[in-house]
């Protein structure tokens, strides 16, 4: 049950990011001016009939956020009680600390009237929470645990390949930086600073500049760099590890998601930031990030056979085997 619940928590985090994207895309961040209450009501007692206009998006975001927070609390407790690997338990504690901090940042964002720095930090930390819940879902999955507990034999071919590890890490970090730049663009109002696509004011490079144009163009340049990195990473997997389903599947998914992300980015500009398209662009960017993270984690595990992650004790390994038999 733990793997299923962990996967559900990760999926709910993606829903939360989409809900947050809706708030920003509709300009509803201050539709509810108080926090942690909603117009003086306890969050779960606020009448549905009053959820109209921007209040709908902001209050919905709060409801989803509080639900995800509670789910992560349960996940952290479950890991503490049932997970034999100390480093996985620590991931649960870290996810809990991150989501609490995220909630506080969300409150400060409202109470301080959407300061850019806090809003950007709030958006950026959401991605970290998603990465943590996704990692927990991955390492508690039956396939990961079975292989880790029952086989410590590294893949000889993968052991000789250090390139994939390096480019996968670089790609994941680059995607996160790109998302932070995107959050900066959104929260500083630079989303339409360059109103055409794929050109910039009819040129490859803008002929005039201001801070918002610079931020917007940095996001486009970052998108090009990230796309090349993803193509290199996925291409390396498909050429050198085409027999490894654990690597091929996220590599192919990564190519599909980045193509979709470019399309959504273009449509965001061409549609003048239509809020659904804009929000889909936000959540799809998060999916690109965690897919790259999964590929990175699996590439390390494929090469080291679990050696990169602190080894669990023999008793813990036996515990995992017993649980697999009982399941």
Predicted regions and their residues:
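Membrane-interface helix-loop-helix junctions at transmembrane boundaries of multi-pass membrane enzymes
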Residues: 79-93, 158, 234-254, 320
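Interfacial helix-loop-helix junctions of multi-pass membrane proteins
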Residues: 23-32, 100-123, 185-195, 262-286
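Interfacial segments of alpha-helical transmembrane regions
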Residues: 1-12, 88-95, 160-177, 246-256
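Membrane-interfacial catalytic/cofactor-binding modules of polytopic membrane enzymes
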Residues: 176, 180-226, 231
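N-terminal signal-anchor transmembrane alpha helix
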Residues: 2-29, 173-186
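Extracytosolic (periplasmic/ER-lumenal) interhelical loops and adjacent juxtamembrane/interface segments
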Residues: 24-59, 191-213
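A juxtamembrane structural motif centered on a specific transmembrane helix
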Residues: 135-149, 163, 167, 291-327
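Individual transmembrane alpha-helix segments
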Residues: 49-71, 210-226
